[in-house]
Regions:
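Short, positively charged and aromatic/hydrophobic N-terminal segments
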Residues: 5-6
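N-terminal alpha-helical "arm" segments
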Residues: 2, 12-13
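Charged, low-complexity intrinsically disordered regions
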Residues: 25-31, 37-217
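Membrane-proximal amphipathic alpha-helices
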Residues: 17-20
């Protein structure tokens, strides 16, 4: 019986694969943003912190839309000092700069919660609860402003719908602060770029940021 013949080694054409993106780069790519070098400094008086109203803490990750984009969108991840009460080590910020204010006043909003939480928000902001006249919206979203009457008059159905989408049940807990053309949503819990809830949150925030302001006739 003839012996076995040794077959020559076969060379398989391996395909080169690009290395997987890290979660931050993947989030930026998905939403059309460009990863940027984070700003230096971690105190509240650095230009970046002051411009966007951030508390102390180093910004470790940053992505933003093209400079010519309107509105200008940014996503930032920031480390924060250790807080025994919240146990939050980092915070996610969604930031939009619009050419014109969404509402003519300064205001803030968050999902409706315990009455004590609302009282804390009122004390810290000095604002009053805004009653839009839409009972369903007012029960789901708390809007605070020092100019409550003017803010209420500007809460059109489109604005209410966009805010309700941002604070719908299942979204990460957070607070939206607005003044001038600036909108900034800040997480009240740890939310990382790989969190499955971030995609829907980003879409809702962009919908609010791109909302057109209806001018009086």
């Amino acid at each position: 019986m003839a012996g076995w013949r040794t077959l020559p080694a076969m060379r398989w054409p391996w395909r080169r694969r690009n290395p997987p993106l890290d979660p931050w780069a993947e989030l930026a790519l998905e939403h059309g943003l460009n990863v940027q070098t984070p700003p230096e400094g971690e105190s509240e008086d650095t230009p970046f912190h002051e411009r966007f109203g951030l508390a102390a803490g180093r910004v470790t990750h940053l992505a933003e839309s093209d400079a010519a984009a309107t509105p200008q969108l940014r996503v930032a991840l920031q480390t924060v000092p250790s807080d025994v009460r919240t146990r939050v080590a980092y915070r996610l910020h969604l930031i939009a700069e619009r050419p014109e204010p969404l509402l003519p006043t300064a205001w803030r909003a968050r999902a409706a919660g315990h009455p004590l939480e609302l009282q804390v928000q009122r004390n810290s902001s000095g604002g009053d609860v805004v009653r839009s006249g839409d009972d369903g919206f007012d029960a789901a979203v708390h809007v605070l402003s020092r100019e409550a009457q003017a803010t209420a008059g500007a809460l059109t159905p489109d604005v209410r719908d966009a805010l309700a989408a941002l604070f719908v049940s299942g979204r990460p807990a957070g607070t939206l602060v607005a003044g001038g053309g600036l909108l900034r949503w800040t997480a009240d819990e740890e939310v990382g770029p790989s969190d499955p809830r971030v995609g829907g949150l980003m879409d809702a925030f962009k919908g609010l940021a791109h909302l057109e302001v209806l001018k009086p006739a």
